[in-house]
Amino acid sequence: MPPRPPPPAPAALSPRSPPEPRSRSWAGAGGGQGGGEGFEYGASQEEINAAIADLDPVTLTYQPGASSQESETAASALRFKEYVEERSDGKITLEIVWGQAIASYTELEDALVDGRVDLAFHAAIYFPEEFPTIDAFSKITQYSTPAPLTGEAISAAMMAELGWNTPEHLESFKEKGLTPLSPLMNSGDYWTACRDTGSSLDDWNGRQMRIAGTAHTAIAEALQASPVSMEYGETFEALQRGTVDCTFVQPQVAGSTGLLEVAPHVSTFADSRMTGSATAAHVAGSSFENLPLAYQQILFDGEVDHFHGIIQSTLDAQRQAVIDATEAGGEFTDMDPEAEKVMSDIQEQLVDDLIAEGRLPEDIREQMEESAEKWTGVVEELGYTDDGELTDFDDWYEPNGVDFRSLGERVFTEAAAAHRPS
């Protein structure tokens, strides 16, 4: 089948002059800064309808990370939109703009502040100096199971809780005029995907390796590969042309861009996750604080459905990735043990360095292991299971086949609820 084109690369977007910020009038917003009556989390629809009865309808511009509504990674945006519009009784309309068509990631913060975008997926990992906590947290995602379904659920819950429980992480958004709705999100475990077979140390030596975060630079160099930094939207063409030989890639990108059609030889860690999977955030712009309180609460509460959609997006894309690799004559295999050890050692050295720099606490490993134990128990309690392996994921997982809202509610009540607008 013909390759699916990658999402539009930010560099390819046509320059445009920013439109004037839209003028909005929020009914019930005292002094133009939020206000009005709110409602308790879990309130009935009748109670919410009463709270918003006198409020004017609003339309908010929403820029998610997916390239289109048909993308395997569109689920999080669609589930969020469905919840918000239904819960608001149609008074909040989310106008989705796909494919970073309004603002690339480099322009997104300005667009959120000046009003061109109201809500967005932000790949903050591309800006480690601006978001040092995401850069640090992306290097501690290896302390839980790599199981193809439960592993993604556990890791998503672990990192979401960590994000909400770290004040300086939340402040990194607020100081830029942004409101975090989900401050730390996963796009799935990392894999390596190559044009050619082989994951031994000899195979890695000299390869051009596309990297997605600062952790990957050190790992690629330890393998004697040459790290090449580029956003995921540029990676398909680079692999297709042979500009790069391999890429670090997560399921959401692998399954939604067709990367594995040109780099079908995938290697994964045998018994642990690869570092780097916490990369992004779901944020609101400057208009959020001017919304009536009840509208703010509806948007915030919608993160339960958005959390469900994030995991669904990961798994749906993961299924497609397995199909793509197989149809392109590739395979999913365990990383060569010697290469995996080199990579794992570097991962732990990066954690040691962050501790030495004071960017992570000395007991961070113990904290993450305790978190993994906690959320593993919750995932088991809620009945989520793996019915096969990653290699045959397309045989036993059906798209949109698992509802993760019950897990999302646990994350919300145990971590996010303390930050709910009030």
What do these predicted ranges mean?
Residues V97-D110, G213-A215, V228-R241, P337-E338:
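Short helix-initiation/N-cap motifs at beta->coil->alpha
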Residues M1-T59, P399-S422:
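Short, low-complexity disordered leader/linker segments with a strong preference
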Residues L78, E82, E86, T106, ...:
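Solvent-exposed, polar/charged alpha-helical surfaces in well-ordered, non-transmembrane soluble domains
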Residues V228-T333:
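Pocket-lining segment of extracytoplasmic ligand-binding domains
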Residues G36-I48, I125-Q208, A212-A225, T326-R420:
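Contiguous mixed-secondary-structure segments that line small-molecule binding/active-site clefts
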Residues G32-R79, G99-A103, V253:
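Extracytoplasmic "Venus flytrap"
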Residues A74, V97-I140, W191-D196, T247, ...:
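Pocket-flanking alpha-helical
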Residues E47-N49, E70-I92, T214-A218:
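Short, polar/charged alpha-helical segment
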